[in-house]
Swiss-Prot record:
Gene Ontology CC, one term: cytosol
Highest taxon listed in the record's lineage: Bacteria
Native organism: Actinobacillus succinogenes (strain ATCC 55618 / DSM 22257 / CCUG 43843 / 130Z)
Gene3D superfamilies: NusB-like
Keyword tags: RNA-binding, Transcription, Transcription antitermination, Transcription regulation
Physiological role: Involved in transcription antitermination. Required for transcription of ribosomal RNA (rRNA) genes. Binds specifically to the boxA antiterminator sequence of the ribosomal RNA (rrn) operons.
Identification of the protein by name: Transcription antitermination protein NusB
Amino acid sequence: MAEQKKKVSPRRRARECAVQALYSWAVSNNDATEIELSFITEQDMKGVDTPYFRKLFRNTVTYLESVDVTIAPFLDRTSEELTPIEKAVLRLATYELKYEPDVPYKVAINEAIELAKTFGAEDSHKYINGVLDKIAPALGRK
């Protein structure tokens, strides 16, 4: 019997792309609009909920200061000590927890853990989980 490949949801793909775009934006210091446009035109967007990708990326950038202020008290190190991927994943998940009430908090946290497993260092998903587990109740999401 052939092993079936698990189909990745369009929203998960949107989150993957948003984390990659946030990472690119953070390390390149290029304009967010340019990053978004080049991402959509140059990356494989097959199977991606593109409107959701755009919403996640644009709004995380727009609300960045508020998102970072929300994250800061729950870190055990400075924001500068986070890897760019950890920062991108935390920012995206915190944006969803804070500004997307239709996304259940467990989904936002689980998606962030999966993103950290995919893109982050070996144990970064554990750190991401710990931080988000503190942020969610502080935002009234648990």
